[in-house]
């Protein structure tokens, strides 16, 4: 990946964390820290219900915050994972949870996270 710095790689589902234990989180964070050092990797935060079928804001918050802190707002993208997410939640719960998680970000940071980064990376 470092050999081709102009190719943008999107890491899907925040690296797909499967479990919500402290040991798993620490191991996941260690891997994400290594990945985040590669500047052409963008982290798409989506589908966290796949590893946590009864997820809450509090259960996903450490994963979301870690991604945002490691990759920075400029290299994170919000996404849903429909229709798979519908197995574990509903659309308004997902959207409202992420709105709550990002409430302290500036308007520019929210715009970047929720749509501007995706527009740039996907060329839409």
Task: Describe these PLM feature segments.
Residues 13, 43, 81, 110, ...:
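Divalent metal-coordination and catalytic microenvironments
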Residues 28-31, 55, 59, 82, ...:
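Tryptophan-centric aromatic hotspots in well-structured domains and transmembrane helices
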Residues 1-77:
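Catalytic pocket-lining loop regions of alpha/beta-barrel enzymes
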Residues 66, 70-77, 86-124:
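Mid-to-C-terminal alpha-helical segments outside catalytic/metal-binding sites
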Residues 48-50, 82-85:
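Short Gly/Pro-enriched loop/turn and capping motifs at secondary-structure junctions
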